[in-house]
Amino acid sequence: DHGVMYGVIDFYKAAKAAGIKPILGCEIYVTPGSRFDRDNKKGEARYYHLILLAENNEGYENLTKIVSRGFVDGFYYKPRVDFETLREFSKGIIASSACLAGEVARNLAVNRYEDAKEAALRYRDIFGADNFFLELQDHGLSVQKAVNQQLIQLSRDTGIPLIATNDIHYTQPEDWEAHDLLLCLQTGKKASDEDRMRYEGGQYYLKSEEEMRSLFAAVPEALENTAKIAARCEVEIRFHELKLPAYDVPEGYADAASYLRALSEEGFRARYPEEPAALRARMEEELAVIGRMGYVDYFLIVWDYIHFAKEHGIGVGPGRGSAAGSVVSYCLGITDIDP
């Protein structure tokens, strides 16, 4: 997907069900300036394409952070990220120079070899020598063939390895016409319009190994490197597993559990000045259950935003589910009905 990861989970599940190894990634948009910029220098590209693949679970987490930052901080026509973001979240990620819209290829297409070289070396510096690749594609376009020759030379000059891919937008060769019509629907154009978005050549399908070997017979190492990347990528998404953010505990407390206990004790004395033994025992049992189930951070997070809302005059609900009958919830001020 371009700039988003909406389809990752469905793709992951479908691939696993079919016995196919899922390789998770995103074709992101990289701005040459800051992600906070909302204008461009004259003659400067608004963004470039870059392929990012998750090599492992750390890489997958970093990839989601990169994509999220593109929307939160960098959205301007597209969800863009900058080099600062890439450096911050580069671990566990394998990157490639992408298609003709990538920074390296775009410079090569206009005969700016040194600029392309500088860009390639920058990406290698960000992701590491073993984690950045120059990407060859061949969809029968003359400009692509010319750029490929320069990419091969660039690989020789820099030592950055090559890979060979195909930009896939549909499955079978005969699907090109349906894809073209869908593009017209998406962009509000007629098929007969001259000035419209189109994928020339009809070669954006899932090509076989034989076709790829024929296209890139002159650079077999590019295909070998592509296979090596596929072998390296191992992401295991564990569903139905509790994943909660860690709460930042203030100084003076050993851990989240001790902070939750302190807040609960304070609230207990405020809610029940007589401190009835039966309710104290009930609170102790609830705290023990919360700890065993791994919900300590969750209770602190809920307490934090409920407390913030009440302090700022923001209305909150009365609570629902089992938490509405919890003494701890009542003592924390999450609920206001004495259970």
PLM segments and residue spans:
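Phosphodiester-processing cores and adjacent nucleic acid-binding clamps
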Residues: 2-339
